[in-house]
Every structure is written in C-alpha cells, then in structure tokens.
C-alpha cells in the first residue's frame, strides 16, 4: 500500500511563509526514503532499546510519539502521536495510529509493527521517540478503548486535514484522533461508539482545558494553500483566527502536557539517537537538541556488526 503515515508535520511547515515554497514541492503520498544498510541497522538496534523500555514498564498500553520532518525553526520536535499496544495484532508490541490512505483519499486506523513505526521518519540519521506511561486507572480504560475497533473507529473522522481544528468534527489529523481516543476512554468510558462520539470527546476536551498547539503564520499562506493541497483545510478553523493567521492544531507536545496535568503519576521516557550515539532521558523535560546527553541521562553507543 502506497501510504504516508499522517504528515501533520507538513502542515506545520506550511504555516510559515518562508517554508511554503519548499513544502509545496512535498507530496504526502511520496514513499519515505529507504535508509541505507547502516542506517537500517541503527534503527533496528534503536528499536530494540525502545522495546526494552516498553517491556520494562510492565504496561500494556503506552502513548508513543516520534519525530518527523525537521521542524526546529518552529520549535517542534514531535509530529506524530500513536498508541503502542502489547500483545495486539499478533505482535508483542504494535502501534495503532491514524494514517491517510492515498488510494482511498481518506483517513484509516492502521496497526503497524514497532520497527515500522520507528522507521517512518524523514531523518533516519537522527530521531527521537517519546514514551508516556500511564497510571493504572488511566491505562486500563485507554487500553480497553484502543483495542476495541468499534471505539477506535467511533472517533475516526471521515475527512483528513493535516491542520485540523481540534474542536470541529469536519476534519481530523493523526494526533487529534489519539486525543479524541483519550477523551472517549477517560471522559465517557461507558458510552457507545455512536455518531456522537466525536462531539462528546471534543466537549470533554474543552471542559478539561485541553490546549492545542498554536501556530502563527507570518503571512497568509494557508488561505491559498488550502485551495491547492487536498489534505489542508481552513473551513474548520474559526474565521477570526484564520484572519489573524492563527491555527490551533493537536500536536504530541500538547497531548503530553494534557496527560501530565490530568493523569497523576504518569511518567515519561525520551530516547534519541544521532548516528550510533543513543541518549535515554527520564522525565517531562526534553533531551537537549542534537541528542546531547545531560547529567542523569543514560548513554549507549550502538555496536556494529
């Protein structure tokens, strides 16, 4: 299947005029670049370390985010949020996520192996992974909701937009699907996966004070890019915000901030690699840019065959 897993990072890049021309040349359905043998070896070894962290947690559901495009100019590290599940889809660990189906021209819920998820990056030389471990009272309902395909599909939107507005059901992106899945699990655990699932989830998000990431454009690229790029839209954002070049978008950092505030006892581990240099950092602060270790971080140098 020619697919490209949820390129929300594309939308972020489009939100600055200086990057618009470059972003327009990017195709969402392009296949990711195949890593070379050495990079593939690094990613597989790095994936083994991620898997070790998942196993060591003793949990069966974990929020997982990965880096994508280089968005340092926007102060964004993570672009894609998903749910890692133990013993699901006949795999020790798999990742349930939303992706945009290029063949069907609509979003789908997709189960992917952990290795495949980790390799879905545009920079295999340097990548970051964030893992959020939930307390039992928060993990159990999320697990039950995530593995139930009726619930997982109940909060799946019919139309994909990379810059979807979080408080509208007109469109949806990959991170928004995860946020609505959380809302469905935590806000209405006994509710059925009916047509009201998404409005109910968004009402709970708003009531709980969920704050999406705000991007401010220096000009008006989105007003015309939305007419040219089929996976971008303006019609779900409040007109006054569009007029002021403000776009509220669900990003992994916003989801993690919400979880940290609402799930007492949640913990976080971040991993990165720059070549064969790996840093593992525990806590809600980020690893220093460039995958540079700080006091207290664990450092591993990956071996070569």
Task: Show which residues each predicted segment covers.
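Bacterial N-terminal signal peptides that target proteins for export
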Residues: 1-10
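N-terminal signal peptide c-region/cleavage motif recognized by signal peptidases
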Residues: 18-20
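Cysteine-nucleophile amide-bond enzymes
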Residues: 22-305
